[in-house]
A protein has these predicted regions:
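Surface-exposed interaction regions that form or flank ligand-binding interfaces
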Residues: 1-74, 81-86, 92-102, 106-198
Length: 198
């Protein structure tokens, strides 16, 4: 019995050292993702596809970029750069009823589980969040003399406030990125900003 075991071990060692450069299979560790994080990623994907649908020639979309200025760091879900300016889109896929004001640091989210239970959770106010992102990105791009606009897209259209920062429709998104406001960027400026965001 021991001899059979030794033969098997020697055969396996011989197979592994016989010039066969096959790497042993490695298994990826399981990644367990919180449902909120998964819903957020799904919402960002939906919003990105909607934004792509309104893009025109000369519009450039950047997703999930990180910028920092003076020690302040932020991640931007979607940024569009074109001759009309630079536009941030913060995306939220909050499920449930939201309560709060535009200037509140947090909002409250009420969600029913279908069994008569209601759960309350504090969530970040995306309007406050996008205002901070506007500040950081504007400072990051300060040398280009560009006005940065920022908007919130709530995938479930459940905003507790009426705000110019919150876009409600595809038409709102199209109008936001294709209307002359404070900017008219040259092609060279657009190219320079693109390089800063890559």
């Amino acid at each position: 019995m021991i001899a059979v075991l030794i033969i098997i071990v020697v055969t396996n060692i011989g197979n592994n050292s016989s010039g066969n450069n096959k790497k042993p299979h490695t298994y990826e560790p399981w990644v367990i993702e919180a449902p909120e994080k998964r819903a957020g990623r799904r919402g960002e994907h939906i919003a990105t596809e909607i934004i792509k649908g309104v893009l025109r020639e000369g519009d450039y979309l950047f997703t999930n970029i990180s910028v920092s200025y003076d020690g302040k760091r932020t991640e931007l879900d979607n940024v569009v750069v074109n001759k009309y300016g630079v536009f941030i889109f913060e995306v939220k896929n909050y499920k449930g009823q939201l309560y709060g004001n535009e200037d509140d640091y947090n909002w409250e989210k009420y969600k029913d589980d279908g069994y008569g239970n209601t759960f309350v959770k504090e969530v970040k106010n995306p309007v406050k969040q996008v205002k901070r992102q506007i500040y950081i990105l504007a400072k990051y791009l300060e040398g280009y003399n560009v006005w940065v606009e920022g908007y919130v897209i709530l995938i479930r259209s459940n905003s507790p406030v009426q705000s110019t920062y919150i876009l409600q429709s595809v038409e709102d998104i199209d109008r936001a990125i294709h209307t002359f406001k404070r900017n008219h960027l040259s092609r060279d400026t657009v190219e320079s900003i693109k390089k800063m965001l890559v």
